[in-house]
Each structure stands twice: as C-alpha cells, then as structure tokens.
A protein has these predicted regions:
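Amphipathic terminal alpha-helices
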Residues: 298-325
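Rossmann-fold cofactor-recognition segment
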Residues: 47-61
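Oxidoreductase cofactor-interface core, primarily capturing Rossmann-like NAD(P)-dependent enzymes
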Residues: 2-31, 35-45, 60-63, 70, ...
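Short, amphipathic alpha-helical "lid/cap" segments that border enzyme active or binding sites
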Residues: 66, 117, 211-219, 307-315
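Short, conserved SAM-binding segment of the class I
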Residues: 112-115, 119
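General small-molecule cofactor/ligand-binding pocket signal
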Residues: 33, 53-55, 173, 255-260
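Terminal hydrophobic/aromatic helix or amphipathic segment near a protein terminus
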Residues: 50, 239-292
Length: 325
C-alpha cells in the first residue's frame, strides 16, 4: 500500500490544472491522478510518462467522478466557462434553452461544478478540497453589475457547496485566479496593439501566470493548516504600471487606450459586450474580488509561494508572434 498522499486534479492538461500537476509531480510524498476528458491526448500521455495516473472523467457526467475521486486526499477542481462559450455545439444548446450563449454557458458551468462538489462530498479520505472560483460580481456590487456571468457562475457553485455540504466546506479552500497574463499574448481582446479596452488603467488588478503560478499557490493552500479563500497572483499592479513594465522589458512603446462603454476592439454580440462592460465596471468600482473581507493573499499563507515577476513573464515571450518580426 502506498504511503503517498493522492491529489486528484481536474483539467490536468489545462493552464491551472496543468500547473498544479507540474508542481505536485515534483513533490516527494505525493501521487498525482490527472483527470481529463481525453487520456490519449499528447498532454495527458506526457503526464503519464512522468508518473501521473491518468483517468478519464467528464464534467458533463458527474458519475464519472466517483471512481476518479476514489481515495483522494486532495482534490483540485477547475471549470472552463470560455471553453463552453467557444464550443460550436453550445450554440444549439443555448438556442434550445432559449438563452443567450453566455447565460447558457454560465448556467451550465454552475451545474457542472455542482456535480463535482456533490461527488467530492462523498470522498471519506478527503482532507482538502480546492475549488477554482471567482468573486460574485452581482453580490459584491449589490446588483449594480449583474452580467459578469463568467465570474458569478463559479461563485454560485461555491455558494451551493457551502449551503449543501457543510462537512466538505469545513475542509474547502477557494482559489481565485487573478487576471491571466497570457491574455496579453493570445487573447484577441487584449493583445497589445496598444491596450485598448474599457478598463480604467489606474485600477489595481491581480495578475497571474496561471500556467506557472497556480501550482505553487495551490501547494501553499494545501499545506496551510486551515481552509482559506485565496486570491491568486504574482503581482498587484495597475494596467498602466503593467504597460510600463512591458515597455521597459521589450523596448516597445505602449500606452493604454480606454474605449467608451459599449465599444470594443473586437466586435461582439450585444450580450457579450454587456458582460464585458459590466466586467470592467465591476473591477473599476469594486475591485477584482469585490472587497470580499474573507479573501487572503498568497504572501499571507503559512508557506507563502515564491513566484516570478511580471517582468520575468514578459521577458520570455516571443513578441514577434504578436507584432510580427
């Protein structure tokens, strides 16, 4: 019988889950069980080669998590609103439900996470459940910004867990990932032509390299003596400060440009534009995590993670792929 502790990682081939897998594969005393929809993918096979146990489970099939979670000491759970939103098959499902696509994706993500939570609550060996969530924009803005669906969908599942599974929630930590630095490399909304968007450039935000930082932060969460709600980031800095760092590191002159509400550098359907407008407004007025007094920061954890800087992230990117050679 193995004396190692078992961490089960959902989304183990993605940004957040992949970082957690990478971290715990290097930790003596831990066995990694990587959960994925496609165990034969190259990323899944690479994890298996390095010693991870790769198992198949699907967020749309809650029963698949019963065997996947068996014997777990720690479970890291993550979902993907934007994956649902971008899946061509979702358009027909949203139409059949007579819902805008982003509303359908949010509702579906909430239901997926409820299934994960229900399954985790049945694991008697579990010592820590770590749920990747985000702040409830509608709640913390007192209803002023009700359309930040990709935040509230996760927060609703989090609330469900607290209300329906108090024993599980007594050993649950919440991980709120900051704004992904990778958005400045691969997201068409925020590629640095100049930064063009609706966000106040002087509002401070938490920035995270999710593919690098999630694992060390989750490790610190797991090692902490009690459950916490942690905002995950490597730096809290304004967009203006971020752009100054980008210019200093790359030598490329850059400046923020703020568009009026309702406008975007990329054309969106009205319902998504409204969501983004509410998103920028919420961050500007209430902050990334809404002023939730229960949130703690990575440096406040008992085993605070050592993370690289924003400058380090920018230095190693191939900006010719963004701007051309």
């Amino acid at each position: 019988m193995s004396s190692k502790k078992l961490i089960v990682i959902l989304g183990a081939t993605g940004n957040q889950g992949g970082s957690v897998a990478e971290t715990f594969l290097q930790e003596p005393g831990w066995q990694v069980r990587a959960v994925t929809r496609n165990p034969s993918s190259s990323k899944a096979q690479a994890l298996a080669t390095r010693g991870a146990e790769v198992v198949k489970a699907d967020l749309d099939d809650p029963s698949s998590f019963i065997p996947a979670f068996k014997g777990a000491h720690v479970i890291f759970a993550v979902s993907d609103f934007w994956g649902l939103f971008g899946d061509p098959a979702s358009q027909g499902k949203a139409a059949a439900a007579d819902q805008p696509l982003n509303v359908w994706a949010a509702n579906h993500e909430t239901e997926q996470l409820k299934g994960v939570i229900d399954a985790a609550a049945k694991v008697h060996t579990l010592e820590r459940f770590v749920l990747s969530s985000l702040s409830n924009a509608a709640k913390w803005s007192s209803g002023k910004y009700p359309h930040v669906y990709h935040f509230d969908s996760k927060a609703k599942a989090e609330a469900y867990g607290g209300e329906n599974h108090p024993e599980l929630w007594a050993k649950t930590s919440i991980f709120q990932a900051g704004y992904f630095l990778s958005n400045f490399v691969s997201n068409p909304i925020t590629l640095p032509r100049r930064f063009i968007g609706g966000l106040d450039p002087d509002v401070e935000l938490p920035f995270i390299a999710a593919e690098e930082d999630t694992g060390p932060i989750v490790k610190a969460i797991v090692l902490d003596s009690g459950p916490k709600k942690v905002i995950g980031y490597r730096a809290r800095i304004s967009l203006r400060g971020l752009i100054e760092t980008f210019s200093r590191v790359t030598g490329i002159k850059a400046e923020p440009v703020v568009l009026p509400k309702g406008e975007s550098v990329v054309p969106f359907p009205p319902e998504l534009q409204r969501e983004l407008d509410d998103n920028w407004g919420y961050w500007t007025e209430f902050g990334y995590y809404g002023g939730d007094p229960t949130v703690v920061h990575p440096q406040d954890l008992e085993h605070a993670p050592k993370l690289n800087s924003v400058a380090d992230y920018f230095k190693k990117q191939d900006w010719s792929k963004v701007f051309g050679s």
